[in-house]
Curated annotation (Swiss-Prot):
Membrane topology reported for the UniProt record: Multi-pass membrane protein
UniProt subcellular location: Cell membrane
Listed transmembrane segments: 26-46, 58-78, 82-102, 115-135, 136-156, 167-187, 195-215, 247-267
GO CC annotation terms, alphabetical: plasma membrane
PANTHER family on file: ACYL-MALONYL CONDENSING ENZYME-RELATED, SOLUTE CARRIER FAMILY 35 MEMBER G1
Protein name: Riboflavin transporter
Organism whose genome encodes this protein: Brucella anthropi (strain ATCC 49188 / DSM 6882 / CCUG 24695 / JCM 21032 / LMG 3331 / NBRC 15819 / NCTC 12168 / Alc 37) (Ochrobactrum anthropi)
Gene: ribN
Length: 284
């Protein structure tokens, strides 16, 4: 999991570099990121054959992946306008959105402890955004929007597990994400020719982003295959300090003073939530 967090941090740094230093539009970054990742993971799909694509809920798969694609687009756009440390910290509000979505759409029970945890997490996000400060911009809300979209994706994934096999759910994620990102790119009207950076620099950074995306997903899947999610959660939270370190090394960008108390509230609420869920599972 630590390797996965490090790989994702490399993706975030490379994505911010591509958007701010190379001038590649976010829709183009998103498209090539997952095309390259798909190519690198294609051998795994070929191994399972067309069996993984058999489904009677194709429409739900499309809706689920569309939410994921929208989250990716918003995430990458945020990385071109907001410091890495802020983007990553605010994205960690996703579990709290999952609680709200699960209550609204899956009718799952929400305990007072979960409500308090959710409220605490959002207070942490508010402290990081600091809408009362002069440095606040509307771009600061983008990571929260991405977190909400990914929460919708997670809830739909959980719903699909009632009918679909994990292999089918994973396969459709990879297969559908590329055409959806392609459609968003075409709708934007942008082209590769609009990028003024040298081709070598453009393709080098895009390949790095795609390769580390595939690597991060592999490490993450491997981690969840050998350990429980509750055990891995503290290691997953390491992505925040790892991203802060990477961002500081590459961009010399240090977090603001608001970051630390806000991040502490978000991580603390997340860990408490995981501990509560672990206790509930053992009781059941």
């Amino acid at each position: 999991m630590v390797a996965a967090c490090s790989a994702y941090a490399a993706v975030n740094v490379a994505t911010q570099w591509a958007g701010t230093r190379t001038g590649i539009p976010s829709v183009i970054i998103a498209f090539w990121q997952y095309v390259i990742a798909l190519v690198l993971t294609l051998p795994l799909l070929v191994r399972d054959g067309t069996r993984a694509l058999r489904t009677s809920h194709f429409g739900l798969h499309v809706m689920r992946v569309a939410l994921a694609a929208a989250g990716v687009q918003v995430w990458i756009y945020a990385l071109t306008h907001v410091p890495i440390w802020q983007v990553v910290a605010l994205s960690m509000t996703s579990p709290f959105f999952v609680i709200l979505c699960a209550r609204l759409f899956l009718q799952e029970k929400v305990t007072p402890a979960r409500l308090l945890t959710t409220f605490t997490g959002f207070i942490g996000a508010l402290i990081i955004i600091a809408p009362w400060s002069d440095s606040y911009t509307v771009y600061s809300l983008l990571p929260i929007l991405a977190a909400a979209l990914w929460a919708g994706y997670s809830v739909m994934t959980k719903y699909l597990t009632r009918f679909e096999k994990p292999a089918s759910i994973s396969a459709y994620m990879l297969v559908l994400l590329t055409p959806i990102n392609a459609a968003l790119w075409l709708a934007s009207g942008l082209s590769m020719s609009a990028i003024t950076a040298p081709d070598v620099e453009i393709w080098s950074i895009l390949i790095v982003i795609g390769a580390f995306t595939a690597l991060a997903q592999y490490f993450q899947t491997a981690a969840y295959s050998i350990a429980d999610a509750v055990y891995l959660q503290p290691f997953d939270d390491l992505r925040l300090p790892i991203n802060v370190i990477f961002g500081w090394i590459v961009f010399a960008a240090a977090p603001s003073i608001n970051f630390w108390p806000g991040a502490a509230l978000i991580i603390g609420a997340s860990l408490y939530l995981m501990r509560q869920d672990s206790g509930t599972s053992r009781t059941a």
